Curated annotation (Swiss-Prot):
Disulfide bonds: 6-23, 13-29, 20-52, 22-40, 31-38, 58-73, 69-77
Species for this entry: Phoneutria keyserlingi
Location relative to the cell: Secreted
Record keywords, A-Z: Disulfide bond, Knottin, Neurotoxin, Secreted, Toxin
Function: Lethal neurotoxin. Causes spastic paralysis and death in mice in 4-6 minutes after intracerebroventricular injection at dose levels of 1.5 ug per mouse.
Gene Ontology molecular function: toxin activity
Superkingdom, natural source: Eukaryota
Domain notes: The presence of a 'disulfide through disulfide knot' structurally defines this protein as a knottin.
Organism ancestry: Eukaryota, Metazoa, Ecdysozoa, Arthropoda, Chelicerata
InterPro entries reported in the protein's UniProt record: Toxin_34 (IPR013605)
Protein name: U5-ctenitoxin-Pk1a
Cellular component aspect of the GO annotation: extracellular region
Pfam families: Toxin_34 (PF08396)
Tissue: Expressed by the venom gland.
Length: 78
C-alpha cells in the first residue's frame, strides 16, 4: 500500500507497515509486549541514525522535514 500520509509522535501506528507510518527521520513505530498498543515514538540518540537510514526509502518521506542522517556522536562532540 502506498503511504500517502504519516502519523505524528504519540499517534497509534501500524506495526506491519514499518516505520514509514510515522512522520520524522528519527520517529519509529514502537509497540508494547505482544505487538499491541503501537505508537509513534522518537528514537533515542543511539538508535536515531539506524532509524533514519531505514526511512530514507520511505515513499512518503517528503511529508516530513527530512534531514541528513547523522552518525551518532560518540565523543568529543561540539
Amino acid at each position: 500500500a502506498e503511504l500517502k500520509s504519516c502519523f505524528p509522535v504519540g499517534h497509534e501506528c501500524d506495526d506491519d507497515a514499518s516505520n514509514c507510518n510515522c512522520c520524522g527521520d528519527d520517529v519509529y513505530c514502537a509497540c508494547g509486549w505482544g505487538r499491541w498498543n503501537c505508537k509513534c515514538k522518537v528514537a533515542d540518540q543511539s538508535y536515531a541514525y539506524g532509524i533514519c537510514k531505514d526511512k530514507v526509502n520511505c515513499p512518503n518521506r517528503h511529508l516530513w522535514p527530512a534531514k541528513e542522517c547523522k552518525m551518532p556522536c560518540r565523543r568529543n562532540c561540539g
